[in-house]
Amino acid sequence: RDGKPVIAGDFAIDGVPGTGARITLYFLEPGGSKTGKLLPTGNVQDTITLSDGRTIQVSLVDAANPAVFVKATDLGYEGTELPAFTETDGGVLLNTLEDIRTTAAVMMGFAPSKEAASPAVPKVCMVSAPQTYVASDGRTIKGNSIDIVARTKALAVMHKAYAVTGGICTATAALITGTVANEVVSERAKETNQVTLAHPSGKFDFEICLTNDTGWHVEKAGVARTARPIMKGIAYVKGE
């Protein structure tokens, strides 16, 4: 307004303090951000073997940020567990997700072995069908208001909310026919390409423009955010 960014507003983001003006960000052509392929293995699902001998189905997707997806039910979880859950389960969930993540790192070509995998790439996400649950702040998130429930790691702990790029990858994966995320996402999302993702702190809305004329392709991904000033300073440039 008047040549200056509008900061004040009533738009709120679950997991982010305060409110602000709604700013829609569009990520153009986010597919293959690090691997060069939307589906790094060429498959919508792959079978992997965990360290304990179990075999599970996963989907490897690279959109804005590469990630591996697994169904919560395939690991014996509901999918609505909050980060505090991992403080009382003896590290089982975190260790299992890390096992999956490092296996995917090798499959995506990021590391020669699981032991050499970066702690940050790829991400690992546990997904489940829409269901009612209580968020970290005590609010009830209704199952009919969301399209998919997801949980992800932030390095060595469970993420308290959900990262933007991770959300774009999750929403994209949910709309690619045949992925494990697509098998649990709502029919509403498949019809509208609008995905409301439920995380520990609440909900996150995404708009995915996806085509499949000659293979899956993401034209753009939209997400609403807010902005605020965080610093003000003066840079001094030496004159001639």
Label for each model-derived stretch:
Residues 1-240:
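Non-transmembrane, aqueous-exposed alpha-helical and coiled segments at domain scale
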